[in-house]
Amino acid sequence: MRDRPVTLAAITGAHGVAGEVRLKLFGEGVAALKRYRAFNDSGDGSGLTVVKIKDDGKGGAIARFAEVPDRTAAEKLRGTALTVRRSELPSLPEGEYYHADLIGLPAVSTEGEMLGECIAVENFGAGDVIEIRKADGKKFMVPMKTEAVPEWTDERIVIEAAYADQ
């Protein structure tokens, strides 16, 4: 597991005059964010310390950070991604994955052919789909289902050869 930052939410703007911000969530809702006391902590004191986070009733959240004293400071944070280190995320059961764990992994076929690198994980409603970029720059997508991706580890993604010949 690579211990790089994983984005859980993004600040979309200010909320009110007291320095609260609106958040767009990329995970499992407000409850998943509440387990973290700080975001973007790179060890240099530039992180954001959580004072409170609440559901906004619209699929997002409202947050208050100790370092954001007023609306002006909150507005300057628009577009800021809220990240945590991968090692801070909860462990997952066998067969589950975080999208961040797949991105950047090499992809090989079941026949051992190097296919490229996973550059994205999308979900268009019918389940996750991984996007692979070949060495020549061309891209193809594969459903993240057992028949198409029989195996993945921290080191690689194995794609059924029939799905790689697209």
UniProtKB/Swiss-Prot annotation:
Pfam families registered for this protein in UniProt: PRC_RimM, RimM
Main localization (coarse): cytoplasm
UniProt GO BP: ribosomal small subunit biogenesis; rRNA processing
GO terms for cellular component: cytoplasm; ribosome
Residues of the PRC barrel domain: 94-166
Highest taxon of the lineage: Bacteria
Molecular-function annotations in GO: ribosome binding
Keyword set, alphabetical order: Chaperone, Cytoplasm, Ribosome biogenesis, rRNA processing
Protein location: Cytoplasm
Record note on quaternary structure: Binds ribosomal protein uS19.
Function: An accessory protein needed during the final step in the assembly of 30S ribosomal subunit, possibly for assembly of the head region. Essential for efficient processing of 16S rRNA. May be needed both before and after RbfA during the maturation of 16S rRNA. It has affinity for free ribosomal 30S subunits but not for 70S ribosomes.
Family, similarity comment: Belongs to the RimM family.
Notes on the domains: The PRC barrel domain binds ribosomal protein uS19.
NCBIfam families per record: 16S_RimM
PANTHER family xref list: RIBOSOME MATURATION FACTOR RIMM (PTHR33692:SF1)
Protein's name according to its UniProt entry: Ribosome maturation factor RimM
Organism in which the protein naturally occurs: Novosphingobium aromaticivorans (strain ATCC 700278 / DSM 12444 / CCUG 56034 / CIP 105152 / NBRC 16084 / F199)
Source species taxonomy: Bacteria, Pseudomonadati, Pseudomonadota, Alphaproteobacteria, Sphingomonadales
Gene giving rise to this polypeptide: rimM
